[in-house]
């Protein structure tokens, strides 16, 4: 009798564990999809005068307690996460989004986790000696990254005029961070 109870308890714990793992996976997928819906809904937002301003841009900046006129790519990322109750640093400073605990991929590393939808990318600028542009990954391949990013333009500038869908080369990406875990 004791042996059958022991087997039953282990079987029950195994099933509960599978159920928990599956619900965690499903929950993350739902959150990623909601985040993606939010960032894609912003494609087409443009600055009012080309000076980091306009109703939507100022909303992104306010989320991070920044005034009109500040660069806003990181604020856009934080605002989107915030709209979906994803914990984030609420910062307009790109390096704040790439703390080691959140970084899952870095250029030239052998220990990378494959980036996925709703992760964020960072581009390093040697003249600034830091990551100075960020946005969302919508699709990742070995050679290309489909993105949605704020404060860019058709040419891919880090000081742009709106929210755009872009295709970047994977080799342009310096780091990837994951906030949906």
What are the residue ranges of the model-derived segments?
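Bacterial N-terminal signal peptides that target proteins for export
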Residues: 1-9
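Hydrophobic h-region of N-terminal signal peptides that target proteins for export
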Residues: 13-21
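N-terminal capping segments
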Residues: 20-87, 180
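...with weaker cross-activation on analogous glycine-rich loops/strands in unrelated enzymes
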Residues: 30-37, 86-155
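Helix N-terminus capping/helix-initiation residues
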Residues: 53-54, 93, 169
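Short clusters of hydrophobic/aromatic residues that line enzyme substrate/ligand-binding pockets
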Residues: 57, 97, 163
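Active-site signature of cysteine proteases
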Residues: 143-181
